[in-house]
Amino acid sequence: MLYLQIMSMEININCDLGEKSKHHSNKYDPDLLEIVNSANVACGYHAGDEQTMSQVVKISKKNGVSIGAHPSFKDPENFGRERMDLSESEIKKLIIDQYEILQKIASSHGESVSHVKPHGALNNMACEDIELATILAKTIKDINKDIIYLVPVSYTHLTLPTRDVV
């Protein structure tokens, strides 16, 4: 008798949420939070605010959705899509400050931040610049070694430093 072993695979459906701004409505966030597994929550620098973050965290908790920080350059006018030339210490502060804002809100709901996915120009620049990608990976690891760093897998500059840091 021939037995076939079927491999199981888990797929995580992930979405950028809480991006309320003049560029974007968060009208459908509650509906999306019913179908996603993890949410990248805007931390107020490119979009969103503490009230919006709190709403997303509350609904995420209710639906069992993992909460992630979605840090960006402080660029609400351009929705975080304007490239900026910042020093290493400025980049670290940018990531840490936004993570801490969301973590404080998550904690108030009995939750914690499980992952980080950079937004917009910050993420795009890291895809092209191994030094920036390494700074991001190390900063995220320094925040909490158990936090997942979501990176586009097709970008070598982001995946290599992530493997080296972990």
Question: Which sequence ranges carry the predicted segments?
Answer:
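Single conserved hydrophobic/aromatic residue that forms the stacking wall/gate
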Residues: 157-166
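Charged helix-capping and loop-helix junction motifs
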Residues: 129-135
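Hydrophobic faces of well-ordered beta-strands that scaffold small-molecule active sites
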Residues: 11-15, 39-41, 67-71, 118, ...
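Glycine/small-residue-rich loop that forms an oxyanion/phosphate-binding "nest" at active or ligand-binding sites
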Residues: 77-108
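Active-site-adjacent beta->alpha loops and helix N-cap segments on the catalytic face
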Residues: 48-59, 130
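Acidic (Asp/Glu)-rich catalytic clusters
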Residues: 31-34, 56-66
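Active-site beta-loop-alpha junctions enriched in small/polar residues
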Residues: 16-20, 42-46, 72-76, 121, ...
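A short alpha/beta connector and helix-capping loop motif
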Residues: 22-53
